[in-house]
Structure formats: structure tokens, C-alpha cells
């Protein structure tokens, strides 16, 4: 019963990875949209995009870490 709860909890924790994937897609979609509107701001927008990508991906990595902790922690 405990093993089933661990597997279920890990599966639910990986839902955060889907959110991270959507978030990264939205970040880069906003970069493409903004660059097409004002190409001269591309260097500044790209640095903001990389920051947004890193923060969004960190949430996904935290979700993955929680899934591994639920599966393999004692």
C-alpha cells in the first residue's frame, strides 16, 4: 500500500513538468512575438528570455526532484 502511494505521489508530482514545458514555450513565443514587433530590442529581450527560461525550468526541476524524493526516500 505504501509503495502504491509513493508511485501515485511521484506521478502527481511530475504534473509540474508539463507546466514547465508550457511555460518555456510561452517564454520563447513571447520572444518571437516581441522581436518581430521591434527587432532593435532583440539583445535586451533575449537576456530577459534566458532569465525567464531558467526560472521556469527551475520549477520543473523542483517537481522532478520531489518525484524522485517520493520514490526513493526512505
From Swiss-Prot:
Gene3D superfamilies: F1F0 ATP synthase subunit C (1.20.20.10). The keyword Membrane applies. GO terms for biological process: proton motive force-driven ATP synthesis. GO terms for molecular function: lipid binding; proton transmembrane transporter activity. This is ATP synthase subunit 9, mitochondrial. Mitochondrial membrane ATP synthase (F(1)F(0) ATP synthase or Complex V) produces ATP from ADP in the presence of a proton gradient across the membrane which is generated by electron transport complexes of the respiratory chain. F-type ATPases consist of two structural domains, F(1) - containing the extramembraneous catalytic core and F(0) - containing the membrane proton channel, linked together by a central stalk and a peripheral stalk. During catalysis, ATP synthesis in the catalytic domain of F(1) is coupled via a rotary mechanism of the central stalk subunits to proton translocation. InterPro entries: ATP_synth_F0_csu, ATP_synth_F0_csu_DDCD_BS, ATP_synth_F0_csu_sf, ATPase_proteolipid_c-like_dom, F/V-ATP_Csub_sf. The chain crosses the membrane at residues 12-32, 50-70. Belongs to the ATPase C chain family. The record marks 57 as: Reversibly protonated during proton transport. The keyword Ion transport applies. F-type ATPases have 2 components, CF(1) - the catalytic core - and CF(0) - the membrane proton channel. CF(1) has five subunits: alpha(3), beta(3), gamma(1), delta(1), epsilon(1). CF(0) has three main subunits: a, b and c. Keywords: CF(0), Hydrogen ion transport, Ion transport, Lipid-binding, Membrane, Mitochondrion, Transmembrane, Transmembrane helix, Transport. It is found in: Mitochondrion membrane. GO terms for cellular component: mitochondrial membrane; proton-transporting ATP synthase complex; proton-transporting two-sector ATPase complex, proton-transporting domain. It is a multi-pass membrane protein.
